[in-house]
């Protein structure tokens, strides 16, 4: 009887799907009663193909076992925690500043860490952006600009002659102009008024040049027909012109037919 029950138990358990293999029971106990998700074959091969950690890296064999973390991570953690260089983003390479080289041999003071430490005289700001460099003033610039020097930087004002930031007396005191300030100011106002008058002039309508294009042939044909009709009306007597203007298109055709018959008779 006992032998019969022992041979029947595996079959019943297989049908009920309640048979626990020793390996499965260990997995369930380690994960809190939850069954683990099977890993992909590529992931398992990737862990096996990791480069082995060097013997002098300070990584123990227990850390290099599969299941805790990858060997590459173990090497990085050992380097960060040890005396070796930290693993991370590489720093910018130092460059030599030739302006600070004294005897041809660059020293420690000549090292500059990147382009942000270049002097402002070279046109570069601390953030690495290039400053806007103004060209020096010329005689032509002084004739159309304010030119009053700034009390802080000493740079001349680049506003036009009608600048409202500076007084007229300070503008007159600027040296280097070809004419007096009053004459230059009058010429400046005259030029501006002339430009405004030219802008107010209406532009001409379509011309021969405008109608000469391939896309404007229809417009040219219509204008030519309109001119021919105007010339035909001007050749008629005054009473017939008034009748032609007041009549409808059909009446105009009838009038032209009657006029042609009268001429023939």
From Swiss-Prot:
Location of the region described as Disordered in the Swiss-Prot/TrEMBL record: 81-105
The UniProt entry, under Gene3D superfamilies, shows: 6.10.140.670
Classification via InterPro entries: SCA7_dom (IPR013243), SGF73 (IPR037804)
Alphabetical UniProt keywords = Signal
One Pfam match, given by its short name, reads SCA7
Gene Ontology cellular component annotations, sorted alphabetically? SAGA complex
The SCA7 domain is annotated at 133-200
Q: Which domain of life is it from?
A: Eukaryota
Q: Does the keyword Signal apply?
A: yes
Signal peptide residues are 1-18
Which protein, by its recorded name, is this? SCA7 domain-containing protein SELMODRAFT_431321
Native source organism of the sequence: Selaginella moellendorffii (Spikemoss)
């Amino acid at each position: 009887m006992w032998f019969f029950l022992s041979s029947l138990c595996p079959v019943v358990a297989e049908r009920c799907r309640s048979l626990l293999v020793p390996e499965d029971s260990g997995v369930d106990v380690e994960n809190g009663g939850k069954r683990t998700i099977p890993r992909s074959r590529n992931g398992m091969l990737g862990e096996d193909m990791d480069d082995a950690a060097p013997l002098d890296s300070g990584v123990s064999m227990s850390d290099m076992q599969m299941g805790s973390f990858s060997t590459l991570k173990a090497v990085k953690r050992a380097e960060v925690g040890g005396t070796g260089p930290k693993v991370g983003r590489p720093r910018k390479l130092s460059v030599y500043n030739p302006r600070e080289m004294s005897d041809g041999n660059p020293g420690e003071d000549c090292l500059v860490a990147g382009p942000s430490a270049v002097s402002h005289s070279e046109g570069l700001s601390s953030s690495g952006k290039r400053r806007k460099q103004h060209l020096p003033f010329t005689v032509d610039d002084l004739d159309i600009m304010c030119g009053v020097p700034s009390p802080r930087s000493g740079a001349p004002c680049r506003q036009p002659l009608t600048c409202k930031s500076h007084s007229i007396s300070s503008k007159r005191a600027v040296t280097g102009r070809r004419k007096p300030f009053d004459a230059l100011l009058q010429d400046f106002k005259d030029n501006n008024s002339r430009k405004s008058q030219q802008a107010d002039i209406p532009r001409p309508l379509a011309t021969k040049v405008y109608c000469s294009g391939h896309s404007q042939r229809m417009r040219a044909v219509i204008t030519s027909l309109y001119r021919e009709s105007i010339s035909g009306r001007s050749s008629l007597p005054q009473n017939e012109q008034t009748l032609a203007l007041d009549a409808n298109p059909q009446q105009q055709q009838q009038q032209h037919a009657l006029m042609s018959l009268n001429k023939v008779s």
